[in-house]
């Protein structure tokens, strides 16, 4: 019995059974039972009731704690319950051993904190014995399951418990006498010493399930397990199923015969000696700090999922960590970079909370789950931020370590099937390696998975990690822009691969044979090609790697590869648009070089260079022609595909390649022309589809490209234009483009092709009227061609448009009908053609055809030609060949009603020689002088011959559709034309065709006809031209007689020459209608004075104006002199005075594609001409500067009226400050209030918009008038009376000074009051806020905005300095912007700075001063004498602030204002200027930031700088 008891005690669950045995420590060998009889005897002697009571108390405490805390846990831990005691009369020792394990103490194995578990060391896991794998009883497996009461202790077991308690406490286990509350406090104290990342790590480890402790099996064959199963099959089966049911843990290696050590299930973590807390019931994570609030998504579940999915697909890239809590995120474009700040949870994109860049960081960089509440918190606490970055850095550092050893081990073990790895290593690879493998399969730049089919690259010398090839190219571009060597974004080791960041030229050996000679030749002909080729040759495609060509394009690309090489062609199919653009630039370079070489163009040593080259034979004879033909054919085939690219920059590059090909391609014979036309046909078809692109820039550029093609040899796409002595015959001009439009019959369901062709037709009719309306240009009247044949081009286009009138696509139908009606209006003076258009409408009886016919008849009635059409006037015109040149409108048509618009009829009557188009009433100079004062309004309707316009529809201002088509003519017509001077910008004009190339102009067409729709341009542009007219208006009576009747009050030049509706109505539309008697004007040009030179009669560039179906006419002022001081009467015009002209937004071929021609061989006289031309350059520049300054001063001379608040008005001579009644009489000299104006009564204070030293600024509203104001409240109360007097005096000075200032760029004051202890300064409301506020909200300004604001700032400072006022505090926070964003006003005239210098408390103004110090001049900070130049220095600092959205000197990084003062005061150089500024603006900033005050120019002189003149 004693032996049995001793054996039971030695093999029981008591931790003390092994702890007391010297052989039992740590090794886990077989227990020796030599002391078992003595131990059993001691236990029996001490048996009594005390053991049972103590066991009952412990049981109650455990049950109490469990009942409180078990329900709070996400999953219930496993308790190791013992089996019921067996009978002492067991037939064999083995059942006795099994029964011995079922003592009354029921030891509990509580999973320890994961941070405390490790592979070695004494702990609870070693001291608490349990059955083998799966034998633990799930005491808390189900929350609602009632626990079975613990087995009653046997009498033999109780003394054993007493003896255990009397011995020393076991290692790592508290005495059971400790109160649970004390242990709870002890654990909480321990938790406060644990870092936040440790909590997160423990919590993550805890999710994997509790630790199941494995004992040392008594026998290696597991017989004890079998007997336990026989004793309590229910419990054993349930406990064995519990770990498997959780699915969190892999089976323990303890079951294997080799597993002879007791190890916990938390591998790889150092073990701590932490006391187990049985009452915590598995709660491992100590109490945490409260998380941040607002952890819920502000969007609906659907919207939340949509945003998350969008972020997970977004093409965003993690460029680098730029601060402790911030990342730099980039897009596909190297210019799109954003700073994301974690903690404040904001982003520099300023797109509001939870922008895509912030979510990218949270979801893909930090790898939060979409359901994580931290994702949707507006701010994160410091410990949460630290936790996120800790995880992020641990993930990155795990990848930086050289190739994953666990991965290697896994492969080795898989291949060798060896069992050399320890059980802990195996479990590590099963749990941690899966995570690490997932990390290694993720690109560290885009944070997305890497697939096998994607193009990947690898860090060869460093971490050996794989990355996306595309992502690495973006990282390489970032390194290049920062002028840094290319390094691995993970391990920072130097990138060995030359796939990226390479600038060497490719070797000619690698190039295809047809281009090899061209590449070698162009190296030596750089002087010929000019700087453009020198720059463009510095790119290479090798760093993009070999791109895969899609299988569907293999056959198509085969001939391209033979000509251009696999490398270039492969890049054309890249998914990265940057690669495609670079490939096209390379293609343009190669094509132009090959064509130049084939044409024998070089610097003169081409023979020697080609002879020494490997492909020298390719430069002679027919081989050149074959090379040229192959290159052109392959290039056209490529362009037909790439011109359909949806990316705008790639499309521009394609058009540049088209131009490079055409200008270097000769075309001398008709056969060559036909071949070139055939090759270009697919390219033109692709561009035609682009004419209807949804992107307005793309559509405008496409139309402009085809118009350049229509210009033939006079356009930018002239064939052989850059070849010396080419003599190319051209490709056909308008006729060729017409053939492309009409040649391929597009299906009616392909609306893109139809709409693109119609858009081009619409513009063709405007740009080339002489091609489609022969009556516009006077041709030889003796020609015998019938009218219908002369109009065959127009009829073919209208037939094409007529087919689409009933199209189901609304835009196609509308545009077709508009083209038809517009053309019908143009031919009203030619009844033959007009009747033909009516006949064409008779082919169908559909609704649209019927309606169009009615509208044409209405037009005929309007111009009174309906009867002539019905009577068949074509057959009764007395055989006059030029009858269509006659006016077919009665004289009474010139009379206008009040609603009608002015018309103009120009009579060119016949003389004995016929139509006297070459004989004018005065010399051409006289006519030019007379017409100098006549400008073209948006709807002038003068035609070139005896032509009158129909009466247009009544003016509809609400639609804002003043369509006008002005046509710039060149001196190529054979007859002089009386038109108005052209006011179009240079981009809308066409160079005159030289006499030598006039033969290319078929049918005496005017090549220079360029219609210019005149939309509402900026008032700044308007004033420029009005001033020009003011200077050019002749001082004689004739000019008064010729005062412009059709002129708008503000001429509106623009190159915006497309027909769609303008964005806003022309300002002149709101003018009053002129007197009807003055709205008709007839210029009778019969005279005896002759002008026989047909080319000399029209010396000025002039305009023919073609009315459309929606033409709107605008009357004008009677006088051509404009008073600039009274001209501005609209706040919008005043605010837009310095904005960029609207024409800058128009995209044309010249602005986007055309480049300067290579330098031609200069004549010997060139140098002399240059010297003569530049002799008076200085005088000319000075005159221009004075003119610019005069314009600037004149433009800023007037401004809007200031709102009036009655209670703030004072009589003349009275003080501006009105003292309220309840204010003490301690402030003499102020005006007593006649009407009270008190806060919260007569005016209401709104939100705070600014905070100063002793002042605060609020939005306010006047109750009586509703006027919005800004009120600056300044308290004047100080500690001493002397200080208070100084403050009051300074405030009075500022208020009185502001009351006398009146300038458009100076803030204006509505009034001031003194109420109680405050001065209230009421100033005008500037809704845009300060420049600093806009910079913080929207980021740095574009350069055009910086120039606009800088100019207005200089105007305001110039006004202040002329009035002997120094601002001393010019900075972004004191520059206010109005609601339009166009008007800048200077505010805060230094009172705060003076107050701050009066001796205030330490640090009281540190924040305000810190913002001011960065803008202060060095001499001011040094305490030296200063003057107006200190404001000029601040202007330079403001330019830096506006250009890069942060103050100069990196002031935001200085927390100590004294250090910043010392830095500026001791500076020997100016603050750094952003490198992206243009040379002009950079020069202005450098002038402002001269260290010596005397070297800085005055603000008035700076206004003369050319950077401000270019915007006029």
Swiss-Prot record:
Listed EC numbers: 2.7.11.25, 2.3.2.27
Residues modified as Phosphoserine: 21, 35, 137, 154, 275, 292, 297, 300, 507, 531, 923, 1018, 1043
PROSITE patterns the UniProt entry points to: PROTEIN_KINASE_ATP, PROTEIN_KINASE_DOM, PROTEIN_KINASE_ST, ZF_RING_2, ZF_SWIM
Residues the record lists as binding ATP: 1249-1257, 1272
Keywords: Acetylation, ATP-binding, Kinase, Magnesium, Metal-binding, Nucleotide-binding, Phosphoprotein, Serine/threonine-protein kinase, Transferase, Zinc, Zinc-finger
Domain of life per record: Eukaryota
Catalytic residues of the enzyme: 1369
Associated disease: 46,XY sex reversal 6: A disorder of sex development. Affected individuals have a 46,XY karyotype but present as phenotypically normal females.
Summary of subunit composition and partner proteins: Binds both upstream activators and downstream substrates in multimolecular complexes through its N-terminus. Oligomerizes after binding MAP2K4 or TRAF2. Interacts with AXIN1. Interacts (via the kinase catalytic domain) with STK38. Interacts with GRIPAP1.
Designated name of the protein: Mitogen-activated protein kinase kinase kinase 1
């Amino acid at each position: 019995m004693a032996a049995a008891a001793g054996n039971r005690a030695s093999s029981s669950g008591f931790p003390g059974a092994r702890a007391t045995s010297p052989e039992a420590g740590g090794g886990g060998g077989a227990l020796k039972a030599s002391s078992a009889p003595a131990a059993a005897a001691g236990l029996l002697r001490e048996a009594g009731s005390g053991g049972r009571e103590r066991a009952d108390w412990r049981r109650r405490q455990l049950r109490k704690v469990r009942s409180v805390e078990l329900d709070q846990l996400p999953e219930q831990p496993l308790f190791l319950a013992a089996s019921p005691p067996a009978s002492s009369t067991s037939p064999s020792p083995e059942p006795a051993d099994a029964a011995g394990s079922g003592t009354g103490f029921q030891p509990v194995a509580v999973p320890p904190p994961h941070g405390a578990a490790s592979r070695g060391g004494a702990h609870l896991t070693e001291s608490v014995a349990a059955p083998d794998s799966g034998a633990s009883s799930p005491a808390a497996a189900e929350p609602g399951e009632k626990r079975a009461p613990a087995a009653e202790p046997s009498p033999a077991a109780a003394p054993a418990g007493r003896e255990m308690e009397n011995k020393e406490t076991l290692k790592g286990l508290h005495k059971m006498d400790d109160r649970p509350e004390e242990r709870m406090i002890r654990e909480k104290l321990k938790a406060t010493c644990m870092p936040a990342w440790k909590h997160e790590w423990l919590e993550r480890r805890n999710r994997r399930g509790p630790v199941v402790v494995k004992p040392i099996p008594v026998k290696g064959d597991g017989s004890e397990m079998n007997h336990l199963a026989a004793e309590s099959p229910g419990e054993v089966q349930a406990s064995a199923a519990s770990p498997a049911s959780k699915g969190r843990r892999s089976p323990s290696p303890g079951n294997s015969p080799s597993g002879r050590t007791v190890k916990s299930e938390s591998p790889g973590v150092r073990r701590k000696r932490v006391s187990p807390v049985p009452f915590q019931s598995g709660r491992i994570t100590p109490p945490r700090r409260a998380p941040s609030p607002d952890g819920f998504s502000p969007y609906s579940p659907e919207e939340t999922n949509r945003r998350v999915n969008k972020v997970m697909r977004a093409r965003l890239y993690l460029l680098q960590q730029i601060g402790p809590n911030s990342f730099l995120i980039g897009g596909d474009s190297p210019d799109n970079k954003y700073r994301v700040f974690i903690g404040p949870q904001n982003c520099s994109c300023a797109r509001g909370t939870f922008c895509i860049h912030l979510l990218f960081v949270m979801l893909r960089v930090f790898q939060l789950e979409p359901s994580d509440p931290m994702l949707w918190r507006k701010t994160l606490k410091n410990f949460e931020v630290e936790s996120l970055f800790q995880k992020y850095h641990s993930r990155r550092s795990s990848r930086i370590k050289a190739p994953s050893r666990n991965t290697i081990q896994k492969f080795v073990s898989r291949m060798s099937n060896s069992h050399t790895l320890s059980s802990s290593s195996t479990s590590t690879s099963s749990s941690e390696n899966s995570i690490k493998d997932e990390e290694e399969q993720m690109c560290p730049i885009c944070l997305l998975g890497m697939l096998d089919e994607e193009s990947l690259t690898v860090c060869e010398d460093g971490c050996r990690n794989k990355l996306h090839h595309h992502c690495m190219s973006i990282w390489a571009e970032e390194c290049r822009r920062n002028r840094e060597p290319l390094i691995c974004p993970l391990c920072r080791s130097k990138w060995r691969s030359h796939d990226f960041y390479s600038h060497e030229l490719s070797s000619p050996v690698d190039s295809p044979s047809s281009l090899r000679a061209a590449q070698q030749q162009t190296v030596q002909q750089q002087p010929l090609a000019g700087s453009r080729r020198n720059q463009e040759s510095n790119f290479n495609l090798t760093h993009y790697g070999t791109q895969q060509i899609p299988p569907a394009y293999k056959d198509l690309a085969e001939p391209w590869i033979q000509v251009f090489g696999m490398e270039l062609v492969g890049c054309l199919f890249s998914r990265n648009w940057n690669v495609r653009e670079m490939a096209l630039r390379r293609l343009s370079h190669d094509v132009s070089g090959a064509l130049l070489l084939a044409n024998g163009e070089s610097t003169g040593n081409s023979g020697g260079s080609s002879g020494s080259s490997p492909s020298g034979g390719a430069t002679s004879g027919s081989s050149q022609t074959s090379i040229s033909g192959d290159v052109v054919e392959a290039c056209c085939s490529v362009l037909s595909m790439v011109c359909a690219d949806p990316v705008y920059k790639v499309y521009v590059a394609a058009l540049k390649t088209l131009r490079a090909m055409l200008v270097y391609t000769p075309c001398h014979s008709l056969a060559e022309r036909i071949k070139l036309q055939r090759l270009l046909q697919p390219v033109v078809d692709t561009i035609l589809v682009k004419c209807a692109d949804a992107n307005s820039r793309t559509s405008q550029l496409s139309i402009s490209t085809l118009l350049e093609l229509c210009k033939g040899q006079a356009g930018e796409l002239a064939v052989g234009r850059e070849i010396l002595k080419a003599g190319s015959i051209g490709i056909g001009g308008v006729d060729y483009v017409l053939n492309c439009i009409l040649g391929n019959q597009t299906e009616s369901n392909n609306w893109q092709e139809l709409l693109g062709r119609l858009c081009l037709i619409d513009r063709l009719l405007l740009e080339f009227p002489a091609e489609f309306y022969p009556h516009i240009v006077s041709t030889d009247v003796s020609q015998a061609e019938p009218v219908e044949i002369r109009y065959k081009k127009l009829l073919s286009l209208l037939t094409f448009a007529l087919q689409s009138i009933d199209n189901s696509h609304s835009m196609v139908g509308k545009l077709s009908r508009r083209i038809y009606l517009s053309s019908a209006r143009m031919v009203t003076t030619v009844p033959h053609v007009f009747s033909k258009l009516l006949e064409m409408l008779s082919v169908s009886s559909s609704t649209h055809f019927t309606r169009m016919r009615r509208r044409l008849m209405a037009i005929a009635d309007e111009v009174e030609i309906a009867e002539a059409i019905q009577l068949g006037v074509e057959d009764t015109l007395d055989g006059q060949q030029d009858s269509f040149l006659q006016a077919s409108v009665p004289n009474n048509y010139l009379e206008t009603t009040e609603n009608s618009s002015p018309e103009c009829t120009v009579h060119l009557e016949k003389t004995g020689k016929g139509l006297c188009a070459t004989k004018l009433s005065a010399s051409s100079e006289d006519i030019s002088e007379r017409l100098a004062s006549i400008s073209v309004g948006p709807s002038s309707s003068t035609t070139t011959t005896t032509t009158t316009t129909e009466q247009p529809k009544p003016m509809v201002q609400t639609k804002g559709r003043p369509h006008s088509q002005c046509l710039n003519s060149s001196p190529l017509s054979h007859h002089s034309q009386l038109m108005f001077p052209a006011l179009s910008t240079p981009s809308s004009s066409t160079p005159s065709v030289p006499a030598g190339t006039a033969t290319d102009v078929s049918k005496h067409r005017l090549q220079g006809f360029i219609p210019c729709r005149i939309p509402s341009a900026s008032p700044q542009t308007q004033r420029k031209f009005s001033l020009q007219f003011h200077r050019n208006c002749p001082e004689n009576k004739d000019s008064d007689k010729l005062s412009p009747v059709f002129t708008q009050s503000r001429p509106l030049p623009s190159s915006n020459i497309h027909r769609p509706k303008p964005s806003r109505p022309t300002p002149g539309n709101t003018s009053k209608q002129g007197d009807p008697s003055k709205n008709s004007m007839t210029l009778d040009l019969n005279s005896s004075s002759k002008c026989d030179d047909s080319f000399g009669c029209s010396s000025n560039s002039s305009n023919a104006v073609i009315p459309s179906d929606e033409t709107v006419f605008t009357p004008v002022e009677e006088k051509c002199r404009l008073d600039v001081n009274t001209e501005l009467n609209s706040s919008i015009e005043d605010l837009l005075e310095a904005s960029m002209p609207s024409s800058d937004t128009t995209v044309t071929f010249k602005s986007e594609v055309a480049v300067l021609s290579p330098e031609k061989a200069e004549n010997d006289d060139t140098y002399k001409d240059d010297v003569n031309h530049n002799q008076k350059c200085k005088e000319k520049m000075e005159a221009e500067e004075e003119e610019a300054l005069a314009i600037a001063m004149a433009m800023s001379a007037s401004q809007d009226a200031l709102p009036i608040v009655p209670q703030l008005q004072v009589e003349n001579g009275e003080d501006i400050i009105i003292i309220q009644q309840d204010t003490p009489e301690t402030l003499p000299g102020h005006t007593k209030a006649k009407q009270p104006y008190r806060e919260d009564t007569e005016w209401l204070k709104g939100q705070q918009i600014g905070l100063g030293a002793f002042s605060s600024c609020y939005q306010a509203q006047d109750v009586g008038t509703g006027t919005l104001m800004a009120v600056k409240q300044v308290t004047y109360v100080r500690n001493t009376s002397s200080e208070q007097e100084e403050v009051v005096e300074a405030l009075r000075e500022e208020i009185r000074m502001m009351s006398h200032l009146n300038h458009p760029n100076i803030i204006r004051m509505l009034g001031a009051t003194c109420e109680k202890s405050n001065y209230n300064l009421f100033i005008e409301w500037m809704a845009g806020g300060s420049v600093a506020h806009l910079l913080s909200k929207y980021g740095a300004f574009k350069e055009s905005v910086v120039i606009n604001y800088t100019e207005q700032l200089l105007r305001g400072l110039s006004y202040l300095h002329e009035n002997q006022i120094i601002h001393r505090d010019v900075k972004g926070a004191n520059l206010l912007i109005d609601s339009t964003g166009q008007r800048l006003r200077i505010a805060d005239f230094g009172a705060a700075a003076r107050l701050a210098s009066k001796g205030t408390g330490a640090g009281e103004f540190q924040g305000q001063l810190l913002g001011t110090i960065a803008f202060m001049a060095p001499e001011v900070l040094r305490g030296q004498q200063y003057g107006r130049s200190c404001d000029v220095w601040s202007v330079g600092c403001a330019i830096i602030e506006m250009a890069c959205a942060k103050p100069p000197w990196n002031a935001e990084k200085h927390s100590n204002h004294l250090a910043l003062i010392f830095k500026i005061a001791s500076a020997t150089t100016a603050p750094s200027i952003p490198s992206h500024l243009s040379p002009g603006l950079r020069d202005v900033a450098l002038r402002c930031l001269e260290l010596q005050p005397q070297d800085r120019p005055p603000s008035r002189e700076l206004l003369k700088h050319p950077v401000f003149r270019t915007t006029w």
